[in-house]
């Protein structure tokens, strides 16, 4: 339980350290599935209209849910909470996930009320996500936010970085109102968690200038100065 150690932070040394206990943190956890949040138990979560990839039920981990663990709406969430318990029980201390992947491999996760509505956020879904994130920190799992993925982080595709219109890309990769709102919502709702990393994106292809602007904007918002990283 990270509440016994305090906030995890970068303090200029090789490893992240907890502000309270001073202990070093060596990240050991699952980096897949990136579609961890593509779960049938979350409100407003549906399978991709084009990818035809089924949503996760996390049913095999129902047996790992314990009395007193969170759930919602008459027992929803027990499978995904059980999956976190399992990861913690086998010695993991972190897990990663995409909060947004419209146009990406899974095309089945978004924080909005609708897949194509980047202006309005789904409050009930975000509340349910927060219950999962809270439990994760309580069982000793760091939250690794992969904020976007390779296929939809900008209007450039492939290794050749060909110009293309990517509908899911927030402001086409630039720091416009869509990207600012997205960052503000995630920071406002989730930055209070003690162990958290902001990853600008999985296999990120934004330009260096766009990466710097996005990282700088997140830094200006996050009052807890959580680490900001980049997956190249």
Give the predicted meaning of each segment.
Residues 11-232:
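Active-site mouth of glycoside hydrolases
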Residues 1:
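Ligand-binding face of N-terminal immunoglobulin V-set domains in extracellular IgSF glycoproteins
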